[in-house]
């Protein structure tokens, strides 16, 4: 871990290397054997595969801040449940067959009476 102290940075950064290898481990060219079967080989040279040079990656990590210094405001995230009264309108249908006091047979349809009733549901 390296410490970077720069005049342009407000506070020092600790640098954590992402990939560190010694130069002996980093090979730019790697020799690969030829994979053709022996009966087809006629003094073919070995194939060379070019592997890109991996760049070293660094991550700049700011130092940990003291959590005791900053006051975290407590916010009440629990909302109080208030009951909302929602009026509902229901239609009540009364079917009344009116019969007159006579000896005649009434073949009319029964009268339909509709009343509006408003109730509050909580």
Swiss-Prot record:
Q: What tissue specificity does the UniProt entry give?
A: Mammary gland specific. Secreted in milk.
Q: Residue positions of the PTM Phosphothreonine? A: 98
Report the locations given in the UniProt record: Secreted
What do the Gene Ontology cellular component annotations say?
extracellular space
- Answer yes or no on keyword Aminoacyl-tRNA synthetase: no
Summarizing the function annotation, the protein's role is:
Kappa-casein stabilizes micelle formation, preventing casein precipitation in milk.
Name used for this protein in its record: Kappa-casein
Please tell me the species this chain comes from: Cervus elaphus (Red deer)
Q: Which gene encodes it?
A: CSN3
């Amino acid at each position: 871990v390296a410490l970077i102290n720069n005049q342009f940075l407000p506070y020092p950064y600790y640098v954590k290397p992402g990939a560190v290898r010694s130069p002996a481990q980093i090979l730019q060219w790697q020799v690969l054997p030829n994979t053709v079967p022996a009966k087809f080989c006629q003094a073919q040279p070995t194939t060379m595969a070019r592997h890109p040079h991996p760049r070293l990656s660094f991550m700049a990590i700011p130092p940990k801040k003291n959590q005791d210094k900053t006051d975290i405001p407590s916010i009440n995230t629990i909302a109080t449940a208030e009951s909302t009264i929602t009026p509902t309108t229901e239609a009540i249908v009364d079917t009344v067959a009116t019969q007159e006091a006579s000896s005649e047979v009434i073949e009319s349809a029964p009268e339909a009476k509709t009343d509006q009733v408003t109730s509050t549901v909580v």
